[in-house]
């Protein structure tokens, strides 16, 4: 692994310890991390790291989802690292930009990992996103603002997200992880 990314490598090792059933996925993330110096740049056309937020309410009972304009589906806030190897900071920045919720804070270590294909669009070829997800908690103010990347935003009960077959499998997985963690 390149010596300038040891922090993410250590965070991935910690995640593997906490989620031993995801060894293969963590290994794929580590191989990708070591593959090229530009893995945090969207210009790296094979794929790149992204940071996302599992944005929960102050009481932890609800999650804020966005209906993504380009992908036309409900997702968690998140986006490109744009050269920033500190993916928790990326997740927080994207949550703030995409929701407008004030007083957000990142909690703890990596919460979830997801590797998924992004379809070709315009001059951008199909590519991989290596998405590193963190819990981001709202404070008392849960008011949101819809920006140009979203068609809608909605607070949803985590327990409902876990069982909603119309939602992306990774959202349901994160909801189940959250429910197990907060029983």
For each of these PLM feature ranges, what is it?
Residues 14-52:
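Acidic, metal-coordinating catalytic segment for phosphate/diphosphate chemistry
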Residues 82-170:
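Unchanged
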Residues 1-7, 180-183:
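Short, low-complexity, intrinsically disordered N-terminal peptides in bacterial proteins
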């Amino acid at each position: 692994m390149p010596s300038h990314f040891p922090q993410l490598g250590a965070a991935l090792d910690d995640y593997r310890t906490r989620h031993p059933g995801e060894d293969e996925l963590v290994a794929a993330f580590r191989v990708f991390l070591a593959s090229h110096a530009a893995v945090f740049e969207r210009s790296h056309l094979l794929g790149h790291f992204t940071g996302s937020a599992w944005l929960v309410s102050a009481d932890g009972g609800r999650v804020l989802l966005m209906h993504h304009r380009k992908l036309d589906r409900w997702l968690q806030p998140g986006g490109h690292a744009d050269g920033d190897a500190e993916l928790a900071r990326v997740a927080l920045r994207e949550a703030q930009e995409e929701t407008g919720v004030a007083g957000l804070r990142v909690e703890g270590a990596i919460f979830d990992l997801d590797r998924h294909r992004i379809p070709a669009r315009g001059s951008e070829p199909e590519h991989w996103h290596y998405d590193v997800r963190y819990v981001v908690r709202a404070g008392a103010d849960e008011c949101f603002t819809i920006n140009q990347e979203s068609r809608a935003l909605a607070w949803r009960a985590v327990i409902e997200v876990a069982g909603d077959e119309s939602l992306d499998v990774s959202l349901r997985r994160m909801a189940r992880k959250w429910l197990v963690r907060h029983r």
